[in-house]
A protein has these predicted regions:
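C-terminal motif of bacterial Sec signal peptides marking the signal peptidase cleavage site
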Residues: 25-28
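Multi-bladed beta-propeller domains
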Residues: 34-39, 100-117, 159-176, 229-243, ...
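Aromatic- and Gly/Pro-enriched helix-to-coil junctions and flexible linker segments
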Residues: 37-38, 42-45, 50-52, 88, ...
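Beta-rich catalytic cores
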Residues: 51, 89, 118-120, 127, ...
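Short, conserved, GDST-rich strand-edge loop motifs in beta-rich repeat architectures
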Residues: 58-88, 134-152, 191-220, 258-271, ...
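A short loop-to-beta-strand structural motif that recurs across blades of beta-propeller domains
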Residues: 92-94, 154-156, 224-226, 270-272, ...
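Loop/turn-rich, solvent-exposed surfaces of beta-rich toroidal or solenoidal domains
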Residues: 307-432
Length: 921
């Protein structure tokens, strides 16, 4: 897509300034660079209105290379946008009674910081009388800037009427970093915090100590959204993620828009929205719009992140677009039509006729987002839309500067920004007003040498005033029960609905009808709900990276399973206030769709509905996760009072209900135990998850359908179903946390590969290879997998392990922190040969040049993160493939195959509990 052409079409032309402003006016004559800056309007008076209101901003030192290596707390010359803790020492909050350079400025935080603290994240109350901000007290020199022993960030408030500063958050028993506060319409405050109040409470329920979970790169405690009263009381957590949720602001409809660092989805930062109580959280914009940043080469494919979004009075969204690092704390300002677009080229509605693109540069200055390269149009640190009807914004902007010969500073030009030795000079951000209608940038405040001014705001009432969204509360007894049980409801119309396309064979309606052959071959049979395990900081528990496995999926636990109904619908109760994801499974409990690459969460009593599934998550695929992007394919029951076509007559539907909703209404709301069905649910409500993988054939019986549906029963233990014994696992089941029979919101299924040293009796994958199996001699099973898959025979002779797979628990010769079997089943490994009684790597000649002997590498029999890709191994045991050397059919039970499958699908981790894994060195 030619973003430049689209931008020109929007603006008509790239409007340059009517005059050039000497940079000396910007930063002080005694340090004036040579040259002029483009796109600046000179000789103009301020538009009436802005000088009538107080103004607040942050003054901070210009960041330069840290030459004081002894001071570990010194501010670096650049800060990654994902680093929400590192502070710029020497920054303070300043206020002027009017927004004019002629009005004296007052440092209102100097008594707290003594010039050695830090201030950031300014926001103005809806009535324009208060400024809320983050402040960090002076750091200790002998500790790193983000060391947990350093002072925390806290939320403070400046009252313009009384001219007083009040601290709102403090270091109580739940202390953490508090940043990015924003006023809600009712006076409460939403902010990002590492306190993780609800998350830490759930850790106690899981039998773990309380700690502040860290990000997936284990660099910082996770910042998540919290809400508190105007005086700092009543603090509670409203967002749940495995990486940061931060920088909230309020839309005119009352919802909060915020930046989310997605864990899986490319690891980028996109915009999400939520109600102030945490309900209705969803993607808002940008998941597939990251490779759209302008660059100095004239194209628009730099990878950018969407930060610090604020809504203009006209409803358009402003955001800072910049890469993670390398653009001197600044970037471009983009205007986003988020009301009509979810991505730059994807409308938010399938019927939308609004022309795109969904975003474009807010100015015509020619700002680029190349890391470590000059930006001809300078860079923006922050923006603040003015709500005075003038279509302007207050910005902190720095012109493009480079280091010239002899240490001089020069304004960028076509002649001095080319070549391999261009050195970008430190930015010098000051305050400007950008007029969208005129396309001009006008100076407002300058700064002395070595100082910059950022985050300017005007203490003016916001117009229109954002709507107030009250916190949700239970509307009936059923919803109150959900709240009491700590769960919400997830409804999926059909897992065969892929981005609005019916992928069922031949279609959903036919496949859902027991009178059709496709009913009995439907591929999607279950969903598995997985939870991310909160990783503690290294000060609490130091982990080895091998513990997480090779799939890069972190540690995970299984919350439970539920059947997919014949129309592909699902209606389930999910634990509230935990990040969870969904896998769609076949009858063997193996994932059949692409891995779901984002986390969801529910509040207690909340019901969240989605149409179906989505494609692989590549940037070429459409975004998902925002309501209304596609129309639902599954329209539900056509009429009220009749069963679905061909199904059991007792399950009568209401018009528009999916099969899952009908089943849950009858079993959960009316209290029916479904006793007349062929195989009753083991729990009274069909929405409740189970630890076992069970499908009761509720939609058919011998009266209505000549061919009844088959049940599926994959148990951990041996059970009796319909009079027949099922094969589970002939030992103890996986580690179970919380109440799982009957299921509760605290239920967790934890699977490890290695022997959990804390509780060796718990089942682990390695145990499968040493479990005794048939044939039975004198009442005792005599065979184990390690009898053959072992470098030493039962006669104590050296041998090549059967199938070149060593399943013993000896230390791996490649990495002694893991056992050999883990190495051989999940990683490519050397083929072995027996040479004169000694095992050696088999080698072949690589012709080169020069010719060399290289080992023969064998593919891993299993794939971490994908049980379906491990089918060649798994089918040797279920009778669908017979090994010509030794038939393995029945060597592993159906329950054991299910255990291996789910362990592979969730990531093939070595451990899935940080407190079971040994402490790393």
């Amino acid at each position: 897509m030619n973003i430049q052409r689209l931008r020109e079409a929007r603006h008509g032309y790239l409007k340059m300034a009517v005059a050039f402003l000497p940079i000396a006016l910007l930063i002080g004559c005694n340090s004036a660079p040579t040259g002029t800056a483009p796109g600046l309007a000179g000789g103009q008076a301020l538009t009436p209105g802005i000088t009538n209101y107080p103004m607040a901003y942050v003054k901070q030192p210009v960041l330069t290379k840290n030459t004081n290596k002894k001071n570990k707390a010194a501010t670096p010359d650049d800060i990654d946008v994902r680093d929400l803790i590192t502070s710029i020492t020497g920054s303070d909050l300043y206020v002027r009674n009017t927004a004019s350079a002629a009005t004296p400025e007052v440092n209102v935080t100097s008594s707290l910081t003594n010039g050695q603290g830090a201030v950031r994240d300014l926001d103005v109350s809806p009535d324009g009388t208060k400024v809320i901000f983050s402040l960090r007290l002076p750091l200790m020199e002998n500790l790193a800037n983000d060391d947990p022993k350093q002072p925390n960030w806290h939320i403070y408030q400046y009252d313009a009427a009384s001219k007083t500063v009040t601290q709102l958050t403090n270091d109580d028993v739940t202390a953490g970093h508090d940043v990015g506060a924003h006023f809600l319409p009712d006076g409460r405050i939403i902010f990002a915090s590492t306190r993780q109040l609800a998350t830490q409470a759930i850790l106690i329920d899981e039998g773990r100590p309380q700690y502040q979970a860290v990000t997936t790169d284990q660099q910082q405690a996770i910042f998540l959204l919290h809400v508190m009263n105007s005086d700092g009381t009543g603090m509670h957590q409203i967002s749940f993620n495995t990486n940061h949720d931060f920088a909230p602001s309020i839309l005119v409809n009352g919802q909060a828009v915020f930046s989310r660092w997605d864990t899986e989805n490319g690891g980028e930062i996109s915009l999400y929205i939520t109600n102030p109580d945490g309900t209705a959280e969803q993607l808002y914009y940008g998941a597939n719009s990251h490779a759209t940043g302008s660059n100095i080469a004239g194209t628009s494919n730099n990878v950018i992140q969407f930060l610090n979004a604020r809504q203009r009075a006209d409803g358009q969204l402003l955001a800072i677009a910049r890469p993670f690092l390398g653009t001197q704390l600044g970037g471009d300002i983009v205007v986003i039509n988020a009301q009509n677009f979810v991505d730059i080229d994807q409308p938010s509605s399938p019927t939308s006729t609004v022309k795109g693109p969904g975003q474009m540069s807010a100015t015509s200055l020619g700002v680029t987002t190349d890391a470590n390269l000059p930006s001809p149009g300078g860079r923006f640190y922050s923006m603040y839309p003015l709500y005075d009807g003038t279509n302007r914004m207050l910005v902190s902007w720095a012109p493009c500067l480079i280091q010239g010969a002899g240490g001089t500073t020069e304004v960028c030009s076509n002649s001095n920004t080319t070549g391999a030795n261009v050195v970008v000079a430190p930015p010098q951000y000051t305050v400007w007003i950008y007029d969208f209608d005129a396309g001009t940038l006008m100076p407002l405040l300058s700064a002395e040498q070595g100082t910059e001014i950022v985050e300017p705001v005007i203490l003016q009432a916001r117009k229109p005033v954002p709507a107030f969204i009250p916190d949700s509360s239970p509307s009936n007894a059923a919803q109150q029960t959900l709240v009491n049980n700590g769960v919400g409801i997830l409804n999926i119309s059909s897992v065969y609905d892929f981005d609005g396309v019916d992928t069922a064979k031949p279609d959903i309606a036919t496949q859902a009808n027991p009178g059709q052959a496709s009913f009995y071959t439907r591929p999607a049979r279950f969903v598995r709900i997985e939870k991310a395990v909160e990783i503690p900081p290294k000060t609490v528990r130091k982990l080895d990276q091998n513990d997480f496995g090779p799939a890069g999926m972190g540690m995970r636990e299984i919350l439970g399973y539920a059947p997919v109904q014949p129309d592909g619908s699902v209606s389930i109760q999910v634990p509230a206030q935990v990040p969870f994801t969904i896998d769609v499974l076949d009858g063997n409990a193996r994932r059949i769709t692409a891995q779901h690459t984002s986390w969801m969460s529910l509040q207690p009593g909340e019901t969240k509905s989605c149409n179906g599934c989505h494609t692989t998550g590549n940037v070429t695929d459409p975004s998902h996760g925002r309501n209304g992007l596609t129309a639902a394919v599954n329209k539900g029951a056509p009429t009220t009072g009749s069963p679905f076509p061909g199904t059991y007559s007792a399950l009568f539907a209401n018009a528009g209900e999916t099969m899952a909703q009908t089943l849950s209404r009858i079993s959960c709301e009316t209290g029916s135990a479904l006793a007349n069905l062929a195989e009753p649910y083991t729990q009274p409500c069909s929405q409740i998850l189970t630890t076992d993988v069970i499908y009761p054939p509720v939609w058919t019986n011998s009266v209505t359908t000549p061919q009844p549906d088959a049940s599926i029963d994959l148990y951990y233990g041996v059970s009796v179903v319909n009079g027949a014994s099922t094969e589970g696992i002939p030992s103890t089941p996986p580690m179970i946390i919380g109440n799982c029979v009957p299921w509760s919101a605290q239920c967790r299924i934890t699977i490890h590969y290695a022997n959990p040293a804390s509780n060796p009796a718990d089942l682990f994958i390695q145990n499968l290879w040493t479990t005794a199996r048939g044939p039975v001699v004198a009442g005792v099973a005599t065979q184990t997998c390690t009898n053959c898959h072992n470098p030493v025979s039962l006669a104590n002779q050296v041998q090549v392990p059967a199938g070149q797979i060593d399943l013993t628990s000896s230390a791996s010769t490649v990495d002694p922190t893991i056992v050999t079997s883990y190495e051989d089943v999940l990683f490519q490994h050397d083929e072995l040969t027996l040479n004169m009684g000694v095992l050696q790597d088999l080698t072949v000649t690589d012709p080169g040049p020069p010719p060399t002997q290289v080992p023969v590498m064998l593919a891993a029999p299993m794939a971490a993160g994908d049980a379906a890709a491990s089918t060649a191994f798994l089918r040797m045991f279920d009778g669908t493939f017979h090994d010509p050397v030794l038939d393995h059919t029945g060597f592993l039970t159906s329950g054991e195959l299910r255990l291996i499958s789910e362990w592979l699908d969730i990531g093939g981790q070595y451990y899935n509990d940080p407190f079971v894994a040994p402490v790393a060195n």
